Design a protein with these regions (language model features):
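Short acidic/polar mixed-charge low-complexity motifs
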Residues: 27, 56-58, 109
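Conserved, short, structured surface segments that act as functional micro-motifs
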Residues: 75-122
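Residue-level recognition of beta-strand microenvironments
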Residues: 40-41, 65-68, 86-89, 107
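Surface-exposed, glycine-biased beta-strand/turn segments
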Residues: 1-46, 79
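Short alpha-helix capping/helix-loop boundary micro-motifs
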Residues: 22-23, 68-71
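Soluble periplasmic/extracytoplasmic beta-strand elements of cell-envelope proteins
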Residues: 1, 16-20, 49-53, 61-64, ...
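Zn2+-dependent peptidoglycan hydrolase active-site motif and core
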Residues: 31-67, 99
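Surface-exposed connector loops and short turns at secondary-structure junctions
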Residues: 28-30, 72, 111
């Protein structure tokens, strides 16, 4: 489900799917579970997004990162592998500062990521 938040950069209320983790640019971003890199995409507004397919309908999405150089579609990753670094390349949320935007997709639907993160992983 989506949470309505005020986007300081755009000056509007908008739906927000996922969790934002504030961190310094350059902070390592790691895979939350074992899986396969489904995609690495870059857009002007959202910056770079990495999607990992964990199987059984579960995917994790990492937005506003600098992807690791060796990260390519189809590459296998393990839980804890560095997949990139936090970036400030998300132009639609730049007033929020550098942060990781994290989402979880289950069977094609975006769900609350907190249900998949242990308190020690947040």
């Amino acid at each position: 489900s989506s949470t309505v938040v005020f986007n300081k950069t755009l000056g509007i209320y908008t739906g927000h799917m996922g969790i934002d983790f504030a961190a310094d640019a350059g902070t390592n971003v790691v895979a939350v579970y074992d899986g396969t890199i489904e995609s690495v995409t870059t857009s002007y507004l959202q910056g770079t997004t990495v999607t990992i397919d964990h199987g059984n309908g579960l995917k994790s999405v990492y937005n506003s990162i600098e992807a690791a150089e060796n990260l390519t579609e189809g590459k296998a990753v393990k839980k804890g592998d560095v997949i990139g670094a936090v970036s400030d390349n998300n132009r639609q949320e730049y007033k929020d500062g550098a942060h990781l935007h994290f989402e979880v997709i289950e069977n094609g639907e975006k769900i609350d990521p907190e249900t998949y993160l242990l308190s020690s992983e947040k």
